[in-house]
Amino acid sequence: MAAKDVIFGGEARARMVEGVNILANAVKVTLGPKGRNVVLDRSFGAPTVTKDGVSVAKEIELKDKLQNMGAQMVKEVASKTSDIAGDGTTTATVLAQAIVHEGMKYVTAGMNPMDLKRGIDKAVHALIVELKKASKATTTSKEIAQVGSISANSDEAIGKIIADAMDKVGKEGVITVEDGKSLDSELDVVEGMQFDRGYLSPYFINNPEKQAALLDNPFVLLYDKKISNIRDLLPTLEQVAKSGRPLLIISEDVEGEALATLVVNTIRGILKVVAVKAPGFGDRRKAMLEDIAILTGGKVIAEEVGMSLEKVTLADLGSAKRIEVGKENTIIIDGAGAAADIEARVKQVRVQIEEATSDYDREKLQERVAKLAGGVAVIKVGAATEVEMKEKKARVEDALHATRAAVEEGIVAGGGVALLRAKQAVGTLKGANADQDAGIKLVMKAIEAPLREIVYNAGGEASVVVNAVMAGKGNYGFNAANDTYGDMIEMGILDPTKVTRTALQNAASVASLMLTTECMVSESPKDDSAAGMGGMGGGDMGGMGGMGGMGM
């Protein structure tokens, strides 16, 4: 095991704070409407330009081990805030730096760090209660658009697209972000349920312009095994042919003579049929087949429940108003399932979401809910260059998270004002002793930091603005975009309550851990200078020897 350095007390904390400051100073230049960009070097490809706090934080690794530990702890603040609320990463970093900066003064002055921590916790708890009281529910699509545009660094077009997407697919719908093909961002809404499997044979195509198979008012057969023998399918095909309606077959696979027979029947016009593979794998495939069954009002034909293909009746088949099958996707529009059954299924999947342990599972389950409940909206981000596209896409994703957070917990005045109002509402808070009082006091001072940084980035005088805002009431604050004062919510400067709350909680949590640090252990740097040169051997390399007469 490598040798370790063990550093105690003030020296350890001082080095850690240096790391915190390096990271926080790099992140906080991006805060506010007049925040600047940070350019990140890439080992290959063009450098990335970003105004997203967490992207900057993730890039930073410091050479000094102790400084790096400080930086990594603050990085945790940014990434945790990003995970939970999806935005507010820069605010969280600025708050953490401010709490550490204020707190270190008290620790150095000899106050008890544990009591300081208790004071900090008490103050944060009181502030969050006030934030929740001040929170206002987000209902109109105008408010949603405002939240989106603030989070996308005052880009109104992005805010509007997100609000439109939420209108179309509802609060529960899935909204995904993809690279667009044009210069402008556009919104594409898929009504109904879409899954990523296309036709098994191009001979099923009946609409050459769209390169798709369109089925109107079709039956849907759901089977969880492979179909290779056409004899199993014949009874179903005969019944469907009599009814004169088309048929979509969703099964693990259709191969060999079964597929050939279906293709021949389709080409001859005897029966309009399309076969696709079932979406997903393993247990997820079964669950998704069940979802489709509930959506279309059919049953999954599975041997486990004693059903077989030969005995299928029309009552076992699902149906839908319309189905579009492309090369890679199938869309089921307006399935015939009962609304109550779909509702019950959505509830069931929601319970699974709450119990899910991995992010991947949770994401997949949320997709299933959206496919059952609303629909899917795709925001295609347009930009002139690859670099701009990446930067814009990151902002759209941020804005999307922020709007979701706003719908969930409501909004408060933006621009750092909500924290100052919460501070005023808390008034005088007392701890159990003088050291706890100091902890409360330092939080109350530190929560001015986001507003100070916004003003500083806009080239203003922070103290003047803070005093002016503190003299006002309610949503009165400073709009750094055009250097005016007024009602923040009317000016459209809002933050989701969840974002502000999460930023404060995470910042205080990590900052108080740093204040209560007394010892740091890191690997000793290896001394390379002596070892590097070793073993060249025989110092003199010997002459080159004469070139010999070249006989010109």
UniProtKB/Swiss-Prot annotation:
CDD domains: GroEL. GO terms for molecular function: ATP binding; ATP-dependent protein folding chaperone; isomerase activity; unfolded protein binding. GO terms for cellular component: cytoplasm. Its main location: cytoplasm. SUPFAM superfamilies: GroEL apical domain-like, GroEL equatorial domain-like, GroEL-intermediate domain like. This is Chaperonin GroEL 1. Together with its co-chaperonin GroES, plays an essential role in assisting protein folding. The GroEL-GroES system forms a nano-cage that allows encapsulation of the non-native substrate proteins and provides a physical environment optimized to promote and accelerate protein folding. Its EC number is 5.6.1.7. It is found in: Cytoplasm. It catalyses: ATP + H2O + a folded polypeptide = ADP + phosphate + an unfolded polypeptide.
